[in-house]
Amino acid sequence: MSKVTFKITLTSDPRLPYKVLSVPESTPFTAVLKFAAEEFKVPAATSAIITNDGIGINPAQTAGNVFLKHGSELRIIPRDRVGGRGVGTDRPSSSSSKTQ
């Protein structure tokens, strides 16, 4: 059975750490996502894998299909960086006014 190799970078860390994973091409990509999340110590259930161009990858396919469609260099991002609840809450709302 052939293997595919992915270089997965954690984009939420300013140091941009990465892991290189080699898996059988028939591996469900959900397993790749889960393993990568565990390696980076981020929650798998609320993480996403995207391409370097920012395109989200549907994990309901095999690792071989992902490799053929998107290549070997991918990024993992925790949901708090992907538009989950709480995004933008650190910014003042437009209704608050500042006096100068």
Curated annotation (Swiss-Prot):
Annotated Gene3D superfamilies: Phosphatidylinositol 3-kinase Catalytic Subunit, Chain A, domain 1 (3.10.20.90)
GO biological process: protein K69-linked ufmylation; protein ufmylation; response to endoplasmic reticulum stress; reticulophagy
Cross-link entry Glycyl lysine isopeptide (Lys-Gly) (interchain with G-Cter in UFM1), positions: K69
Cytoplasm recorded as keyword: yes
Cross-link Glycyl lysine isopeptide (Gly-Lys) (interchain with K-? in acceptor proteins) mapped to chain: G83
Proregion positions: 84-100
One CC-aspect GO term: cytoplasm
Location(s), subcellular: Nucleus; Cytoplasm
Annotated region described as Disordered, given as residue ranges: 78-100
Family statement drawn from the similarity comment of this UniProt entry: Belongs to the UFM1 family.
Function: Ubiquitin-like modifier which can be covalently attached via an isopeptide bond to lysine residues of substrate proteins as a monomer or a lysine-linked polymer. The so-called ufmylation, requires the ufm1-activating E1 enzyme uba5, the ufm1-conjugating E2 enzyme ufc1, and the ufm1-ligase E3 enzyme ufl1. Ufmylation is involved in various processes, such as ribosome recycling, response to DNA damage, transcription or reticulophagy (also called ER-phagy) induced in response to endoplasmic reticulum stress.
Self-association and partners: Interacts with uba5. Interacts with ufc1.
Record's protein name: Ubiquitin-fold modifier 1
